A protein has these predicted regions:
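Glycine-rich ThDP/TPP pyrophosphate-binding loop and its adjacent helix/strand module
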Residues: 8-11
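Primary mode marks residue(s) on the alpha4-beta5-alpha5 output face of response regulator receiver
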Residues: 2-5, 15-160
């Protein structure tokens, strides 16, 4: 019994590390997607998810060390500190025709919703693989967001 408790502790610690390794951001790379519930210092750590899932609200555009700047663009950012300090430069993970709630919030994570949902506050009316906000001219978009890595421009119609 004396040896059982240390073994259980080691198993629990190793299990927790493995869960964080495979679902946390410590090894997250550009092109992978995350669920971010809130953009604040007190929010839960993002979770890696399949980019095709409904919960995948952001995609990692770039990962930079420490306090380095993100590439040119309108990235949301999450900074992680500790043994490994890094910043994730995040793009909205949505396609043309998708609707979102939380887009107009300063801290809420985006949530993909039905375009008929009363919580909807934004709709992506055009998405291109270029970095040119001028592509949004002539659309219903009130906001244009562009990212240099990967090259993307989002034309967003906001409801409020």
């Amino acid at each position: 019994m004396k040896f059982a408790i240390p073994v259980i502790i080691v198993v629990l610690v190793a299990g927790g590390y493995a869960v964080n390794y495979f679902t946390g951001t410590v090894n997250a790379q550009p092109g992978e997607c995350l669920t971010v519930s809130e953009f604040s210092k007190t929010a839960d750590e993002p979770t890696r998810v399949d980019c095709g899932s409904q919960e995948a609200n952001v995609k990692i555009g770039a990962r930079v060390d420490g306090d380095a700047a993100c590439p040119d663009g309108d990235y949301d950012t999450i900074s992680m500190s500790g043994r490994m300090s890094y910043k994730l430069c995040l793009t909205v993970n949505a396609k043309q025709g998708d609707c979102l709630s939380g887009f107009l919030s300063d801290t809420a994570g985006y949530k993909k919703v039905a375009c008929t949902d009363p919580a909807k506050d934004a709709e992506l009316v055009k998405v291109t693989d270029t970095v040119d906000k001028a592509v949004c001219e002539g659309t219903e978009a009130r906001y244009a967001q562009s990212y240099s890595t990967p090259p993307t421009t989002l034309c967003i119609k906001a409801d409020k």
